Amino acid sequence: MKKPKVYYMRLKKMLVQLKQMQTELEQMHDEVEERYDNLSENRKYSDFGYEMEEAIDNLYNAYSDELDSLIDYIDEAANGIKG
């Protein structure tokens, strides 16, 4: 059986990777919002524009919430191993 330290280190490595993913997701969301802001007024305020903005926000929020939960869960597990 592997020592708890091995599992702890693997979980911490996973945390770093997940936090990097979270940062990348935030950057992508910012880029997409910037592109949305640069749409013409006609497109931005059309049904297409409203639906696009809502879809972008919903997708970002769903991924962000799941990543936050996963990070919290793994952090809790790592701290439980560390004792």
Task: Outline where the language-model segments fall.
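Long, low-complexity or tandemly repetitive, helically biased scaffold regions used
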Residues: M1-G83
